[in-house]
Amino acid sequence: MLDRREFLAVMAAMPLAGAAAIGEAHFPNRLCQFVWRNWELVNTERMAAVLGTSAGNVLRLGAAMGLPGKRTLTEDQLRRIYVTVIRQNWHLLPEGQLVQLLGWDLERLRFTLKEDDFLDHKLGPRPECEPVRWIALTAAENKAVAGMRAVVREAFGAELGRPGAELCGFVGELSDARNPLLRSGIGGAGWTLAPVADPRLARAGERFLRFVRESFGGGGTGRLTLTLQAGMAGSRTTIEAGSVRVEAGEVAELMQALYALQDRMEELESPTLPAGVTERKTVWTPRYLYSYFALYGDPLFEPEADPFPDAYLEKLARAGINGVWLQGVLNTLAPSAAFPEFGKGSETRLRNLKELVRRAGEYGVRVYLYLNEPRAMPAAFFASRPEMKGSSYQHLFSMCTSNAAVRDWVRDSLGHVFRAVPELGGVFTISMSENHTNCFSHGGAWGVKVPKAGDCPRCAKRESWDALAELFIAMRDGVRMGSATAEVIHYDWGWPDEMVGPLLAKLPSDTRIVSISEWSVPVERGGVKSAVGEYSISVVGPGPRATRNWAAASKAGMTNLAKVQFNNTWEISAVPYIPVPQLVLQHCENLRRAGVQGLMAAWTCGGYPSSNLLAAKAYYFDPAPDAAETLRRVARQKFGAGFADAVAAWDVFSRAFVEFPYGVAIYVIPVQHGPANLLRMTPTGHKPGMILFPHDGMKTWCGKYPPEVVERQFAKMAAAWRPGLALLERAVAAAPAGKRRGAAMELGIARTCYHHFWSVANQVEFYRLREAGATDRPRMRELVKSEMALARAQYPVAREWSVIGYEASNHYYYTPLDLVEKVLNCRRILEEL
């Protein structure tokens, strides 16, 4: 399987311009394509300005094609969908018009393409596009437009006019602190809070009382007492008639005990809980993940695009998460006398970081900075600093960490950050991937052999572990300048086995290691053998690589964390979570046996407060839970009376998902796009782009798998998944009103998985037949009709739930109108067949 770094290396070698744009024959002309593709992504006036016409003309053309009423997008929506806008126009507009459409300047576009999570590589080579201008349609084009409208009406009818959710509507939902009414008509005098000295505890207690009032109409009677007990490990909750007493040694532990009470009340749909005493001790900490909707750019400089609103932080905390991470770039966070060009805007960023840390702490959540440092610089940076110039990669050069002045800068910059914000939870680093950083970071056979430092005159003579140990110690010393307790965690992504032992032996024992749990687990699907080399939920960890690295960390006196994905992976990231909690809990049980001490629970995808996370939460504490009972309780909490059917559906989905043909090229296969990916009778001539453009590159999609096996496995997985949908439909129908919306969204997520899996099987078979000469045209027509049916079935799901098709670093893979376009595309293909 082509992993992330290998894919980026391949894409870096490809030309970035000069390729022919892909034409779309299902549109009468490029003007119609522009209006259609941007209808729900760009406001009318901006579209008109790009075309050189009036807003009225744009609206009339959209209506003539059968498009639904034009919406007005807010500034917040626009800042959250720019990747989708760029993608939709990559094969349509020249650079100047694309800049105008975004409302940016050319410098910002080029910076975004380069720095925004390798966006230029995801999009692929830049096509040559002629400007799109407003023109009067010919008689033939008007006739074709009328035909489009007829097809749209026939396929979607009144469904197309339903407003559904707004783009990125999930931001408002996750930012909403209100609790749904679960049950009314409960008598009682209400709940009260005993006086609390600690202000944070008092606010936590008031939030608990608000939850009871809103969830149960103010019913029930009780008095809540919150007590901090110095030296106490874990928490103790005592429930008696008319009172609840919660004791803990730390504020965060006490908050988790309160969240457990809320879970139990939601499960029982009652503010009155059975009497008893519950004692818990934390076994995994920290447990941190990324925001579901953070913008990848510079969130600390743009607080209006808040990646962690208060209500979202509370929802994550209720799901057992006690840490969140965001990227920090050292040369933007700290000034430097040695490098006066660094640190511009750092005061603003640190002020905003301090406020985020304060707000997160209100919910028992700590903030971690992801460091990929020191960032490589252009050659001009080293004109007066030749002694610092390290290995080269893609026209940039490392700030060589064998130079003591560079390490001093790293240390002092982190010291500046942690003195300014000592309450930070800590940092975690990636040192062998992503951006070019230390001289070894792109040094050859990644993850397999010991890296080399290439053309660095100093590091080329050194072992990688010696240079990295110096860098890691500088980082640790910088953190300790401001905090004695902040975590210093090193992520082993890309570390070769030979490097691990010597490196860890040189590190201080107060640093920690995080290892990808499922990495290198052997797997056989459809008769094809492979091993995990990316994130996976369908393959359950831990694997031999992680257990070796954890053992090496223990031998060096360090504690360890597991890097996991409990919500989703690139197996399918078009949904906020894959509803397979049985697999998640199997992973948790394995990790408990392995003795890990903390979790990194998500990379950029996977930050949604889901039923998967709620189920995993039971394993974060002692005593160890029972998996079956955990699933029943979470299902009752989320589905109410329909819980048994929900558990049965999850079991069906979990058993189906282990058929995923792991080892396919998950970065390019159209599992993220499903039925929105257009069919092509004629080869496009374009290689797939990472995540964003699968195109028609079927052989690339399949990786080492024969296409027939990929086709068969996706079809098998979809067929096995389908019975779970009927079970989940019953569970939703039985859910009480206060739980029905969340239950219905989970059904929409499950349907999306089914539609995407089946569509991938269709597309692989279609292109397999195309490559064989398109002689079996009856079967190809069947596949095209199946794709049309899947697009129609997915449309109301995507329209109703704004989470569908969205991922934080890629924005929307598709919008509802892309599914309507797929029907037009398929009708055109049928004409050719």
Model-derived features: where do they sit?
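Short secondary-structure boundary/capping segments
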Residues: 116, 305-306, 340-343, 384-387, ...
